[in-house]
């Protein structure tokens, strides 16, 4: 995208808003949030992981965050690590035109805001004789992230006379110099004279004081080139996807951007955790949120994935505490996060050098798995207990999703050890994975309304229920607030789907079951039906006990329930489009209790939802577009009736362009190396620059 396009490109068709005379409008005809007159809580967010900026509809930087180090805490079941934050609030710009100062953050003029290329916010401030365009970005240069936010400012003369223009210095303090400002401010360009229709450009950098040397880098660099490079980074991350319904493309990209923006890095480039989403920045790190938000990295951002694996290798297991005992069984799935991400990373990239460089990853993953396996008692099934999922229980004596994670960890490590020629370990974990899968499919299922399906977990005395007494213990009992819909006569009904249990939804992504397997399909269909006690037909989502009318990951499970019904799936996607706020983000809790469809809220208890965004990207890629790697072979099997074009797609170890029609797949290998692609009957070796054509199967 050229700078001219940045200035003059049309307004984003979906994600935009306008403030004029105190009235908020949008050209988005679909979002439920268009009906909310108050813009409180609506933010447009900018991130490169080292820097996070949350801007309001007027363009004020509400909060600018730089990330620091980690520390252990003892507070919530799903939180035992915090990250330190350095923050500054309420930063705004002023311009001077012909001697008059204009405050851009004041609502005394018409303000338009949208997102460029589904990533960076663009503000257009309209005045009688000129307009000011501000594009905010956190620089990503040749994959190097700078610890700063940059605002590129363009002042456009819309009169027949020349204008004297300048951008005023941003105040370094409010009332006295000792006021806390955790930021360095540097400006390029000061004054200019512009003739009719000419443009003056300025740049302001808000720099982390701990990276003070980057101020000089800013002063010596071409900032418009930085903007182009940053936009190009996201263009490469997204690829050029086109579909009959452009709204789905925009929704997908914003979900990927939300996952990306959930994460924090310190100045040294180490991942130090995540937030709920891109807003707000939180000291607390919910490990489970971080895990799901990171799943797209396994496919699209290998360097970030490596750093996330290393973080979970250090912090995945809850340490021994006084409030919570800790240990592997505190949360089985969280304890396995490093092993899971390592498995998915290898599955998509085929890279073994990372594991040779960091041998502790496989050593620690194996140790955790061996400690879990050692718990098994004679006569017990090949299943293992877990207390917590995140802040809610891993329900039952044995929880289905948690044991599924153990299966994926074992299966994935077996593949890695095989390539590393550690064949005895590979064989051991393959055998364990086989036994786990057999136990999960035979013992954690029941004959449901739609056929055989998975339970949330299994009980001890009765398979489909679990006594609430198991949780009526000090501290533990606080988790019962999330279970109000499933407790009957002192028993928890395990024939249900928890809106924050996402691993069963990910079964095809994990390659545990095919998405056409009746066992998987029946489970998803049940989850999105009135037979699931947590499902709400009114809002087409899954409720969250006494806390919230809906939890957003549940909407992704509901989406997958109609994967193979073209029209029904389109209707589910339509609902996700409607639930996206005017910036394109999803909120963790979009509904209050007892709300009607469309009665959405912002910033209700939780922030934006990186968990659901990562889940959406992963399920759409693996199940809808049908892209996956199996033993280094690329498989592409889109759902029936789907047509799309995806040029310059970097997916794991592949760099390809795909054309998908109703009858044929055309795949061009753009990578430097030959690529192995399956056409269901045989494996094709596709050389660089070559295109293959695969006939789509009729089902």
Which functions belong to the PLM regions below?
Residues 2-14, 18, 421-470, 474-477, ...:
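Non-catalytic carbohydrate-binding regions of carbohydrate-active enzymes
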Residues 193-219, 326-333, 369-431, 463-474, ...:
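The feature captures the catalytic groove of carbohydrate-active enzymes
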Residues 232-347, 499-510, 544-551, 556-568:
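Substrate-binding groove/exosite segments of carbohydrate-active enzymes
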Residues 272-274, 279, 315-329, 382-399, ...:
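Acidic/His metal-coordination segments adjacent to aromatic residues that form catalytic metal sites
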